[in-house]
Design a protein with these regions (language model features):
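Conserved SAM-binding loop
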Residues: 18, 97, 117, 148, ...
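Short, acidic loop-to-helix structural element flanking the phosphoryl-transfer center
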Residues: 6, 87-117
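Active-site neighborhood of HAD-like aspartate-dependent phosphohydrolases
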Residues: 2-46
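Helix-loop "lid/cap" segments that line or gate small-molecule binding pockets
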Residues: 32-33, 54-69, 127, 160
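Metal-dependent phosphoesterase signature
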Residues: 39, 61-99
Length: 219
């Protein structure tokens, strides 16, 4: 995408880009793991970033030394984790989104760009409601409408589809390597922020959210 004129839409990962709920994920998984007698630390938690709840559980169960678990039991563990996580999410408020993020999204929207969320989380809408940011996005593609999580491109392709835009006209903003891989697999350009700002596959690398305005040709 050599010309900013081709950019018509921005698709944002949620966690680690718009909001930061890593600590809640960690606390919820750890509570479940501790109860099961499974070793779990922040290094293992880092492997869970950007992947689905089911895949996250399988990673955690690598340390499980008990009898093999049935699909039903695994589903119970995932529900247990999510219930704890949602309780923690209830503490979120509008203050959990920075003024810089809000202002940048507003400027992008006013400049005519369509905005979407592309997240593997099934709690995306709930989180956006809690931080009072649901109305900032034209579409939400999340864990409720996909069958494959990142690095599969499905979540971003669905977001583009919901926006009515072609993949080549969409730019993805991601903080995880798996998310950048998913964006490239979708044939979309990718902006790396946070950890992903060090990933060579990212087309753009930024340190601050407001740098998106330069990429969009607004500032």
């Amino acid at each position: 995408m050599e010309e900013t004129e081709k950019m018509k839409a921005f698709i944002f990962d949620l966690d680690g880009v718009i909001v930061f709920t890593d600590k809640f994920h960690y606390q919820a998984w750890k509570k479940m793991a501790d109860r099961m007698g499974i070793y779990f630390d922040e290094a293992i938690n880092n492997r869970l970033r950007g992947v689905s709840r089911a895949e996250s559980l399988e990673i955690i169960l690598e340390k499980y030394e008990g009898e093999p678990l049935s699909a039903e039991k695994k589903a119970e563990l995932m529900e247990e984790k999510n219930n704890t996580y949602r309780e923690l999410l209830k503490t979120m408020t509008a203050a959990d989104v920075t003024d810089q993020v809000r202002a940048t999204l507003k400027k992008l929207h006013e400049a005519g760009f369509k905005l979407a969320i592309g997240s593997s989380s099934k709690n995306a809408k709930f989180i956006l409601e809690k931080v009072e940011l649901l109305d900032a996005f034209d579409a939400i593609s999340d864990g409720n409408n996909i069958t494959h999580s990142k690095p599969d491109p499905e979540v971003f392709l669905k977001a583009g589809e919901f926006l009515g835009e072609k993949p080549e006209d969409c730019v993805v903003v991601e903080d995880a390597y798996a998310g950048i891989d998913a964006a490239k697999a979708a044939e979309m350009e990718a902006v790396g922020i946070g950890d992903a700002s060090r990933y060579e596959k990212a087309d753009y690398k930024i340190q601050n959210f407001e740098e998106l305005l330069k990429i969009a040709g607004i500032e």
